[in-house]
């Protein structure tokens, strides 16, 4: 069991890690008990996670909670297209863990479905099988950012910022005239 020994207590009491109040980078700039990061990353307060519960989902739960948001697990909610569309106005971003699919083809199809259903919601792909984080726009058709797992909280925060920017580009590309339409 992970934890800390509280040296301030009379008998150096052991405190489990889950009960320790740790300082957080999200604590700086608090205004009326709300972090500045809440309005930046989780203004609507909801994230959907596609994937199996485990270490990655636990980290996402904790980090998003620190930002003032909450995570809904799609498998537990029975996520279909109608459910996603109803939830869309409250969504800040979508997380897709590679564990959500049986193979890469199914993963890509799932991401394409999410992109078509909710193009305006930033989509982050989490995968242990990629060589490194990818913040470019080459995979724009399926996601805004790809993160290699396991990942750090700092990488996650950076990815959220970049995912929003990449998503604006993606939505803009949908509105732009297509090259084939220009020739006609």
List each language-model region with its residue ranges.
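Conserved phosphotransfer microenvironments
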Residues: 57, 81, 87-118, 130-134
